[in-house]
């Protein structure tokens, strides 16, 4: 048996697509705004 290849890291995930990371840039804010408008239950990771 070979091991699974893609095993994600929570820290990396939070740093790239977490709420604080999104709020840091203008485009990230746009993402949050769009997700709010659409009524998403989860705005970010």
UniProtKB/Swiss-Prot annotation:
The keyword Ribonucleoprotein applies. The keyword Methyltransferase does not apply. Keywords: Ribonucleoprotein, Ribosomal protein. GO terms for molecular function: structural constituent of ribosome. GO terms for cellular component: ribonucleoprotein complex; ribosome. Coiled coil: none annotated. One of its GO terms (biological process) is translation. Belongs to the bacterial ribosomal protein bL34 family. This is Large ribosomal subunit protein bL34. It comes from Microcystis aeruginosa (strain NIES-843 / IAM M-2473). The gene is rpmH.
